[in-house]
Amino acid sequence: MEFASLLAGERWSDHPACTHPLLAAVARHVNDYTSDAGRARLAELIPSVIGLTGDDLHIDARIALGSARLALPVVAADRQRVLAVGVLSCERMLAVLDGRPVGALEEQSRSTLAQVPHAAAWAARFTSAAPASVTSAKHFRRQAAPSIVRNAAQGIAQACVPDPDGMLRTLLVQAIDACAAWAHRDPNLDAGPDPAVWAAACRRTGGFPIMETTRPDALARR
């Protein structure tokens, strides 16, 4: 995220104003848990996060739900309960936002939870007893959603999977896509990184590959 702040013309920071806070959190976690060898593949995604902002709670809910659904089938048992609760919490928030019955789940959420039946049953009991303060929009944005994406990234990094770096990159890519679907992009930041600024940023942090795209959404997500 320090790269993004520099390219956006902000001060050097891992919490840039140019990026939605939860998307920035996903990017930080993915970067922290990715190996040195895998980190270079993240650099090409940096311009994609610049200018993606917005206050719509759908952004938080969609990023968190996608993160939980990706990680839940592969994480250790002790983290499955946390992420199963995360899936149900996100679904409940989306039900409120979209005006659908609370308790109704999207097909992908149902199929994901079906892979971890014991954790899903525990999560259903836990969420049914949750007080109103824990289900509020304020609590979801400030505490629940950040906790979900953190546990998803940590769980993937520690999971027994063939390519944790690849899964972490997917976590970030789908968070970018979820944010882009609901956020507005700042038109002042929509022209892509200035080549000179990008080159300076690469030199400053050790030489990530130079971007040669004209727009953030023109990135090839391999």
Where are the predicted features?
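Eukaryotic low-complexity, non-globular regulatory regions
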Residues: 211-220
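Structured binding/interaction patches within domain cores
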Residues: 12-204
